[in-house]
Swiss-Prot record:
Function as written in the Swiss-Prot or TrEMBL entry: Component of the mitochondrial ribosome (mitoribosome), a dedicated translation machinery responsible for the synthesis of mitochondrial genome-encoded proteins, including at least some of the essential transmembrane subunits of the mitochondrial respiratory chain. The mitoribosomes are attached to the mitochondrial inner membrane and translation products are cotranslationally integrated into the membrane. mS41 is involved in telomere length regulation.
Organism, as annotated: Schizosaccharomyces pombe (strain 972 / ATCC 24843) (Fission yeast)
InterPro entries: Ribosomal_mS41, SAM_Ribosomal_mS41
PANTHER family associated with the record: PROTEIN FYV4, MITOCHONDRIAL (PTHR28235), SMALL RIBOSOMAL SUBUNIT PROTEIN MS41 (PTHR28235:SF1)
Gene: fyv4
Subcellular localization, as worded in the UniProt entry: Mitochondrion
Record-given protein name: Small ribosomal subunit protein mS41
Family to which the UniProt record says this protein belongs: Belongs to the mitochondrion-specific ribosomal protein mS41 family.
């Protein structure tokens, strides 16, 4: 019983914000990216047109969850792409567009033998 109490105390009082999304910091704009439109133009794949007006502020871009993006009508591929580029920007990597990969010969299930 004592062990369970210790685990409860450690989990709830020492690490209260470990699973909190809002505990993370919002990075400052850098390297020619001063607002959300510049960010979306830099990452490519026409994200600036797809999310037009859905991200008003810089904080909103980094605080908005993918569930909120889904409620606003952003499709799955775009949500995943924005989330991955957003995390790369937080980690300090250079933001650049990833090419859309094309399957060869219809994918691995239809692979030529």
């Amino acid at each position: 019983m004592l062990i369970l109490k210790r685990i409860f105390i450690i989990r709830n009082f020492i690490f209260p914000f470990s699973n909190c999304r809002y505990a993370s910091t919002v990075p400052s704009p850098r390297s020619g990216i001063s607002n959300t439109n510049d960010f979306f133009k830099r990452i490519g794949r026409d994200t600036a047109e797809k999310v037009n007006g859905k991200f008003e502020s810089w904080d909103g871009l980094f605080r908005k969850s993918t569930k909120t993006m889904k409620k606003e009508g952003i499709d799955v591929r775009t949500r995943k792409y924005i989330a991955s580029q957003r995390n790369r920007f937080k980690e300090g990597f250079i933001v650049k567009p990833y090419p859309v990969m094309v399957k060869k010969n219809g994918g691995e299930r239809r692979k030529r033998k």
